[in-house]
Regions:
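Divalent-cation
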Residues: 1-14, 19-121, 125, 131-134
């Protein structure tokens, strides 16, 4: 949990973008992306100024995961980018490298956010909590 929160802080240092991680045991939808979209709204991640929030969603017992990017960042990166990040995370999970897989994904998303939504200096504020959310 602490390593993941630290990765979020590091990833957000050079971007105005926001990253959150939500972990639960079971996904109550057939598709993990549907649950990620629901949680994105419930966590008010759609209320960032630049619509550049990203949610990593994991349902551990169901072995499902998804990444949901808000409109601003999704328009820049597209579905293929999110799929690539999920594939990379799954590769780490297949090696039982769960925390490293999540942290690497967070840092990669941070780089993409930095490219499209650079840090605004002192004007930039942390709009969303960096703590991992457990459902």
């Amino acid at each position: 949990k602490e390593a993941i929160a630290a990765a979020i802080i590091q990833a957000e240092k050079k971007t105005s973008g926001e990253i959150r991680v939500f972990i639960e045991n079971k996904c109550r939808f057939i598709e993990a992306t549907d649950r990620a979209a629901e949680l994105f709204q419930q966590l008010n991640m759609h209320q960032t100024a630049e619509r550049n929030g990203v949610l990593l969603y994991l349902a551990i017992a169901d072995r499902q995961l998804a990444i949901w990017g808000d409109q601003g960042i999704h328009e820049k990166l597209g579905s293929i980018y999110w799929s690539q990040q999920v594939t990379a995370m799954l590769a780490a999970f297949n090696r039982a490298d769960y925390t490293a897989g999540i942290c690497t994904c967070i840092l990669e998303i941070g780089k993409a956010l930095q490219q499209h939504f650079p840090f605004h200096g002192e004007k930039d504020q942390n709009e969303l909590d960096n703590e991992v959310v457990f459902g």
